[in-house]
A protein has these predicted regions:
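The feature represents the membrane-entry module of six-transmembrane cation channels
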Residues: 2-222
Length: 222
């Protein structure tokens, strides 16, 4: 896992026409305008852990399934201040982000340990430490406070972007990242379901090194 603590920037609450919320418009936060093609949808951390936590191979469901169930909410309608955590990762399948739930298992396991104070501290990943010439440490007490809050949300592309609007979601990533307080780089060792390593002729092994070689992942890191 890699961690990158970001500075919070003013966030937009521009409505998304296709998935527009029907609640009273007076409930919408007033904020700076934003030209992101797709509104930001997020999942409450507690809901994420309830749905996917403590499962060895959780089935990662689609945006449409979670939205219909009420698990996904549009960011601009969340009242008050919140903490946003952006999950950056390399897809494990060509058509599905995590076909057997391996990455989601590692993510929820790590979040639960941080939430319970079982990890003493986290430091900024090596890439960003070198890039920004400093390190940022988040202590166990900090993580317990953040992750036990009812106002901590997760953005994960696998189920926070409508399947019919992947391109709009990709183009909106800079806006999403600006809004987030933390980025977690999810890059556990695992095997890609479809991609073949040209050297070994076998399915490619994924890790932090392959994550950094993917163009979109590098884009997110900056």
């Amino acid at each position: 896992m890699g961690f990158f603590r970001r500075k919070v920037a003013p966030a937009s609450k521009k409505p998304d026409k296709e998935h527009e919320d029907t609640r009273n418009k007076e409930d919408v936060k007033k904020d700076d305008t934003d030209d992101a093609p797709l509104a930001m949808f997020v999942i409450l951390l507690h809901v994420l852990l309830k749905v996917y936590g403590r499962q060895r191979h959780p089935r990662v469901e689609s945006f449409e399934t979670l939205k219909d169930r009420g698990d996904i909410v549009e960011y601009r309608y969340i009242p008050g201040d919140v903490t946003l955590i952006y999950i950056s990762h390399e897809w494990v399948g060509t058509d599905h982000p995590d076909p057997d739930g391996t990455q989601m298992y590692h993510l929820t396991y790590m979040l639960e340990r941080l939430k319970e104070g079982k990890i003493s501290r986290t430091d900024m990943d090596a890439f960003h430490s070198l890039l920004y010439k400093h390190n940022v440490t988040t202590t166990a007490d900090d993580w317990k406070r953040i992750l036990n809050s009812e106002k901590t949300y997760i953005w994960y592309d696998g189920f926070c972007v409508p399947s019919s609007r992947r391109e709009d979601g990709f183009r909106s990533i800079p806006s999403y990242i600006r809004r987030c307080d933390f980025m977690i780089i999810l890059a556990p060792g695992c095997t890609h379901f479809d991609r073949i390593d040209p050297r070994t002729k076998r399915k490619m092994n994924l890790c932090y090194r392959t994550y950094r070689l993917r163009a979109r992942c590098v884009f997110e890191m900056f």
